[in-house]
Amino acid sequence: QFSSVPRRKYLIRGIKVQLPNNAKVDISTTQRYVVSTGATETITSGVGHIGRVTYTGIWDGTFGAATWCADPAWCFYNLLTNTRYGCSIPAVNLQKFEFYAISQYCNELVPDLKGGTGEEPRMLVNVLINQRKQIFEAIKDFTSIFRGQSFYGAGIFSVFQDKPETSRYLIGNANVADGFFEYTGTSQASRHTSCTVAYQDYQKLGEVDFEYVEDVDAVSKYGIINKQ
């Protein structure tokens, strides 16, 4: 007997999106969060990363059948090109290999920071968009998932990602006027030394959780200047 109607949550797979023909989606493991115990139970056997995309060989630019995944790059590509609920941008106006490179970086395995040797994909997306919003706002929200930015120029929509790369230009004193750099500073109040991040925990079916992160050296120098 319940005193009120129980609140239910579901872990579902969303829409199917086009993926490169050399892509494979990991669907080997399904988990559920048990509210009464706070534990996570594995329903099917196998060690996997739900929705992660991996690639075999070199991509020739051809897409395969639409498949569900949790890849932020190709979900974003779908949002841009879809003519029913997206931006209706023709595929010829997109640099698809930029999305491919972003996808590879997002799906690399990194430590899960749970105290063991476990790993998890660097970036995944599991969101529900069920309200109308300005397209530029939607694009900004989506690119923030993979630390990206986008711009439109010369008839081409381009997207790039903030990630480690080889230096493209080395600039020294000989490259600037009079051979000297001019530096500008920022106020101390804007130099955040710690951050409190709110996020929806996938293992808890979307329950909001918080994570506190700080720069130890910066805290010792400026004190705690927190950003939420």
What are these regions (language model features)?
Residues 47, 126, 160-228:
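Surface-exposed, non-catalytic interaction/assembly patches
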